[in-house]
């Protein structure tokens, strides 16, 4: 099993990544040198722990957003995703197939006047009332 990282190591690594993201990478040794240059870390052992956690977080950041770390690049990416407008609206299709429940919801939202709605019966999925041993 691995070791538990202290609050000091985690906070220091997060701050270093937020401020110096462009200088860091997936290599422990380069991250160790960057940590040594930018921060006053009292001991070699603590510096290595922080650099190791920085490397771990950098690998996680490459896979996707990491909770507790906001990086300008990720913020811009999220803004772009939130402001996305499709070229063709889903309502501009010739026929929109909906089930009766969806039709009712659209009526409640004042979209009942859409002329291209076609109500279809939903396909029956899994039957959950069968006993466990039966096939």
From Swiss-Prot:
One function term, GO molecular function aspect: structural constituent of ribosome
Keyword set, alphabetical order: Cytoplasm, Isopeptide bond, Nucleus, Phosphoprotein, Ribonucleoprotein, Ribosomal protein, Ubl conjugation
Compartments (UniProt record): Cytoplasm; Nucleus, Nucleolus
Location of Phosphoserine modifications: 113
Gene Ontology BP annotations: translation
Residues modified to Phosphothreonine: 130
Primary site of residence: cytoplasm
Record InterPro entries: Ribosomal_eS17, Ribosomal_eS17_CS, Ribosomal_eS17_sf
Keyword Protein biosynthesis: no
NCBIfam families, A to Z: PRK01151.1
Protein family according to the UniProt entry: Belongs to the eukaryotic ribosomal protein eS17 family.
Assembly and binders: Component of the small ribosomal subunit. Part of the small subunit (SSU) processome, composed of more than 70 proteins and the RNA chaperone small nucleolar RNA (snoRNA) U3.
Function: Component of the small ribosomal subunit. The ribosome is a large ribonucleoprotein complex responsible for the synthesis of proteins in the cell. Part of the small subunit (SSU) processome, first precursor of the small eukaryotic ribosomal subunit. During the assembly of the SSU processome in the nucleolus, many ribosome biogenesis factors, an RNA chaperone and ribosomal proteins associate with the nascent pre-rRNA and work in concert to generate RNA folding, modifications, rearrangements and cleavage as well as targeted degradation of pre-ribosomal RNA by the RNA exosome.
Protein name: Small ribosomal subunit protein eS17
Name of the gene: RPS17
